[in-house]
Structure formats: structure tokens, C-alpha cells
């Protein structure tokens, strides 16, 4: 949903996950927008999950739905202990439990080996190039990350940070207050 379509929903952000040199970084901006108004500039939308913080996760979308999706995924991760298995089990729940309905949110999750997008409709998608970019500035961040990967020797954390900064310069729903985690 375009952030401007419903001015009463808190949403819009940019999250990116980048892999390089055996490392993965997930970065996100800090802006929370309600309709056309910036409500907060320093939100933390990227976190470590799992027993030992072995999974990185970032969320984009309607805030309440994103927190619900986070909680559901984290419960599956705690139960199964493995990223792909937790994502698949969460997707199975969508097919069997009507109460989950449709959440207007996306998660970008990554561990040392795998990167996945988990949608609020129960879809699990693994990107073919190891880059995930979601949210209102996702296209800008994805373009920046691909260019930096192809034409520089920068590490994953630096590329993720710069991709969010570039998106923040272009997308009105994204700022340059970057939070980044790396494995």
C-alpha cells in the first residue's frame, strides 16, 4: 500500500540486507510516519533475534502489523532455532489459521547463510542475489546497494548504511538516521 493512501496508518520505512565477504548486514532508517507527518525520527526497526542474536531482522509496513509479525516470527525462531525452518513454519500457520489474516508488513531476516523476506500474507521469498530491500525507499536502496557491490570493495555494513543514506535523500518516508546490525 502506498503510504499516502491511508493517512491514519503508521508505516513507511526502508530496510536493506546486504551480503559480502561472508558477512551479512541489515540496516534501516529511523523515521516513523503517520500519514504525511513525521512522528519520530529515531525508531529502531532492525534487531537481533534468536537465542544468541544469530538472526538479524528489520521490518517495514504498518507498525502494529510489523510488531505482530516480529513476535510471531520470533516465537517460531525460539521454537525451531533455525531461520528457514522458522519462516516455513510461520508460513504454514498462515494457511491454517484465519485469525492471522493479512498483515500490512514485511520482515527482512538474515542469518550467516540465508536471507529471506517474510510477508504479512504468509509468503517467504529468498532473493536470488542475496540483497533484500523493502519499504517505501526499497527501490532506491536496492539500486544503490547493487551499484556499490558491483563497483566498490566496500564491506556489507558500509554498503547497507550508504544504501539507506541514499534512499533517505530521495524518499520522503525515509531518513538518514541509520541503525545497522552485522553478522
Curated annotation (Swiss-Prot):
Function: Protease subunit of a proteasome-like degradation complex believed to be a general protein degrading machinery.
BP GO terms, sorted: proteolysis involved in protein catabolic process
Predominant cellular place of this UniProt entry's protein: cytoplasm
Gene Ontology MF: a single term: metal ion binding
Gene3D superfamilies (alphabetical): Glutamine Phosphoribosylpyrophosphate, subunit 1, domain 1
GO CC, one annotated term: proteasome core complex
Alphabetical UniProt keywords: Allosteric enzyme, Cytoplasm, Hydrolase, Metal-binding, Protease, Sodium, Threonine protease
Protein's name according to its UniProt entry: ATP-dependent protease subunit HslV
Reactions this protein catalyses: ATP-dependent cleavage of peptide bonds with broad specificity
Annotated EC: 3.4.25.2
This protein's record includes keyword Protease: yes
Subunit structure: A double ring-shaped homohexamer of HslV is capped on each side by a ring-shaped HslU homohexamer. The assembly of the HslU/HslV complex is dependent on binding of ATP.
Species, as recorded: Xanthomonas euvesicatoria pv. vesicatoria (strain 85-10) (Xanthomonas campestris pv. vesicatoria)
Lineage: Bacteria, Pseudomonadati, Pseudomonadota, Gammaproteobacteria, Lysobacterales
Catalytic site: 13
Gene responsible for this protein: hslV
Compartmental location: Cytoplasm
InterPro entries xref list: ATP-dep_Prtase_HsIV_su, Ntn_hydrolases_N, Proteasome_sua/b, Proteasome_suB-type
Family listed: Belongs to the peptidase T1B family. HslV subfamily.
A Pfam cross-reference name: Proteasome
Amino acid at each position: 500500500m502506498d503510504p499516502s493512501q491511508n493517512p491514519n496508518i503508521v508505516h513507511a520505512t526502508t530496510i536493506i540486507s546486504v551480503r559480502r565477504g561472508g558477512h551479512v548486514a541489515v540496516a534501516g532508517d529511523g523515521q516513523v510516519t503517520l500519514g504525511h507527518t513525521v512522528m519520530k525520527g529515531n525508531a529502531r526497526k532492525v534487531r537481533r533475534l534468536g537465542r544468541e542474536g544469530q538472526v538479524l531482522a528489520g521490518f517495514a509496513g504498518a507498525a502494529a502489523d510489523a510488531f505482530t509479525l516480529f513476535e510471531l516470527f520470533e516465537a517460531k525462531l525460539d521454537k525451531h532455532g533455525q531461520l528457514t525452518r522458522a519462516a516455513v513454519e510461520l508460513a504454514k500457520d498462515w494457511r491454517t489459521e484465519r485469525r492471522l489474516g493479512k498483515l500490512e508488513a514485511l520482515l527482512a531476516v538474515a542469518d550467516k547463510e540465508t536471507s529471506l523476506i517474510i510477508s504479512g500474507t504468509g509468503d517467504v521469498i529468498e532473493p536470488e542475489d542475496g540483497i533484500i530491500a523493502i519499504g517505501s525507499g526499497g527501490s532506491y536502496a536496492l539500486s544503490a546497494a547493487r551499484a556499490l557491490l558491483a563497483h566498490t570493495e566496500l564491506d556489507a555494513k558500509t554498503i547497507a548504511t550508504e544504501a539507506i543514506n541514499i534512499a533517505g535523500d530521495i524518499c520522503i518516508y525515509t531518513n538518514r538516521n541509520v541503525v545497522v546490525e552485522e553478522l
